[in-house]
Amino acid sequence: MGKGDKMRETRTLEFKEKLTNTFLKTVSAFANYDGGTILFGFDDNGKNVGIEEIEETCIKIENKINTMIKPQPDYSLSTHNRHQTIELTVRGDIKRLKTLKLEYLFRKFPIMLPTIIDE
């Protein structure tokens, strides 16, 4: 996808124009369901807007996931330097992952639903 090309969000694809902590809820939701991909450097309409400092942003993404979601989800990061984008792929899992706010999230496109589970 080149700059200017557009895509659409789906149940397993989310766009983030820049790195904010809201992506952690999406990671948790994807991991608690069938998995999914977050593309950083795309606006809400799927337009490639690029992201600055790709390597530094990747380190921040890894640090946030590793410290803010327990147990740690199975994920991979890849960069697309030509288009200045980052692809975060989260695999679905049967474990119930949660952010440190201790709320479970399930993704049901187009929204994420908090769910309370009796233990």
Locations of the language-model features?
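Conserved N-terminal catalytic/coupling substructures associated with nucleotide/phosphate chemistry
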Residues: 1-119
